Swiss-Prot record:
It comes from Varanus melinus (Quince monitor lizard). It catalyses: a ubiquinone + NADH + 5 H(+)(in) = a ubiquinol + NAD(+) + 4 H(+)(out). The keyword Oxidoreductase does not apply. Pfam families: NADH_dehy_S2_C, Proton_antipo_M. This is NADH-ubiquinone oxidoreductase chain 2.
C-alpha cells in the first residue's frame, strides 16, 4: 500500500477513536465509529487475497449493522426524551439496544462468531489492530454509559464470553483464531465488572492491550501462524521463545506475572458485592483458556523443533524489523504486578 494512503487511513482510524471517546452526543459518537470502520476496511483488504476480501466484507457488514442499531437507539431516545446526550438514557429498550450494538462491535458472546473468522483472513499486524485498537472506542462508550447499562445483561454476556472464549480456543491450531477466542474471554472479564467498578474495566483494558500486543508482535516477528510454526520459534531465537512463553502465561493470568492482577481484582470486587457464585464459576472456567495457553507454551518453548541439519539454529537473514515496541510491551507484561495497588487507588 502507498505510504501516504496508509498514513491517511491510520490517521483516520485514530481520529475516529478519539472522536468517539470524547463524545457525549449520539451522532458524533456514531460518526467516530463509522470513521474508524471505514478506515480499517482498506487495511484489512490490502493484500487482495480472497480471504482478506471476505474478511473485510464480513467486518463491514457486522460493523454497519451494529452502527445502525446504535443510531436507531439514539433516535428512539431523542424521540421520547428530546435529548441526544448519550449519558441520559432512561428507556429500557434503548439501553438494551445500545448495549447489544456495542457488544456486537466488541465481539462479545453470543455475537462473537465474526471475530475468529475475520482474524483468520488478515495478516498478524492487522489482527493486532482489530483485537486491540478497535476495542477502545466501543469500550469507551460502554464506560461512559456504565450507570445506564442493564447489569443482568452485562453479567450474562460476560459469563458467556469467558466460557465460549475458553472452550473455543481449546481445539485451535491457528494462532490467530486462538488469539481471537482469547480476546473474547478477556472482554468477558471486562464487561462483567463494568457496571460495578468501571475504573477496573479501564485498567483491565489497558493491560489486555499490553499483553495482546506483546504476544502478537512476537508472532509477527517470528512469522508464526500455526502451532506447527510455533514449534520452530526456538530455532529463530531461544530468548524470543521464552518471552513468548511468559507473555502467554501472563495472558492466562498466572502469578507473579502482570496478567494475574486484573483477574485478582475483578474476583475480589465480585466477592465484595456478594456475587460469590459468579466469581467462583468464572475462576473455574478461565482454566479452559489457561489450558490452550499452556499447550502453546509447551509446544513453542519446551519442545525441540524437528531438524535435519547438524546445527542448532536455522540459517536466516538479519531481521530488519524494530523490536522497540515489543520490548516495552514485554516489560509491562511481565513486571506490572508489584505496582498493582498503586495503579488501582
Amino acid at each position: 500500500m502507498n505510504p501516504i494512503i496508509n498514513f491517511i487511513l491510520l490517521s483516520s482510524m485514530i481520529a475516529g477513536t478519539v472522536l468517539t471517546m470524547t463524545s457525549h452526543h449520539w451522532v458524533s459518537a456514531w460518526l467516530g465509529l463509522e470513521l474508524n470502520t471505514l478506515a480499517i476496511i482498506p487495511i484489512i483488504s490490502k493484500t487482495h487475497h480472497p480471504r482478506a476480501t471476505e474478511a473485510s466484507t464480513k467486518y463491514f457488514l457486522i460493523q454497519a449493522a451494529s452502527s445502525a442499531l446504535m443510531l436507531f437507539a439514539g433516535i428512539i431516545n431523542a424521540h421520547l426524551y428530546g435529548t441526544w446526550d448519550i449519558t441520559q438514557i432512561s428507556n429500557n429498550p434503548t439501553k438494551i439496544l445500545l448495549t447489544a450494538a456495542l457488544a456486537t462491535k466488541l465481539g462479545l458472546a453470543p455475537i462473537h462468531f465474526w471475530l475468529p473468522e475475520i482474524l483468520q483472513g488478515v495478516p498478524m499486524l492487522t489482527a493486532l489492530i482489530i483485537t486491540t485498537w478497535q476495542k477502545i472506542a466501543p469500550m469507551a462508550l460502554l464506560i461512559t454509559t456504565w450507570n445506564t447499562i442493564p447489569t443482568p445483561m452485562t453479567l450474562t454476556m460476560g459469563f458467556l464470553s469467558v466460557i465460549i472464549g475458553g472452550l473455543g480456543g481449546l481445539n485451535q491450531t491457528q494462532l490467530r483464531k486462538m488469539m481471537a477466542f482469547s480476546s473474547i474471554a478477556h472482554l468477558g472479564w471486562m464487561i462483567v465488572i463494568i457496571t460495578i467498578t468501571p475504573s477496573l474495566t479501564l485498567f483491565n483494558l489497558v493491560l489486555y492491550i499490553t499483553f495482546t500486543s506483546s504476544t502478537m508482535l512476537i508472532m509477527h516477528l517470528t512469522m508464526s501462524k500455526t502451532l506447527q510454526n510455533a514449534m520452530l520459534m526456538s530455532s529463530h531465537s531461544s530468548t524470543t521463545a521464552n518471552l513468548f512463553l511468559l507473555s502467554l502465561l501472563s495472558l492466562g493470568g498466572l502469578p507473579p506475572l502482570s496478567g494475574f492482577s486484573p483477574k485478582w481484582l475483578i474476583l475480589q470486587e465480585l466477592i465484595t458485592h456478594n456475587l460469590v457464585p459468579l466469581a467462583t464459576t468464572m475462576a473455574i472456567t478461565t482454566l479452559f483458556s489457561l489450558m490452550f495457553y499452556l499447550r502453546t507454551t509447551y509446544i513453542s518453548a519446551m519442545t525441540l523443533p524437528p531438524s535435519t541439519t547438524p546445527i542448532k539454529n536455522i540459517w536466516r537473514l538479519k531481521p530488519n524489523s524494530s523490536t522497540t515496541m515489543l520490548s516495552m510491551f514485554s516489560l509491562a507484561t511481565l513486571f506490572l504486578l508489584p505496582i498493582t495497588p498503586t495503579m488501582t487507588q
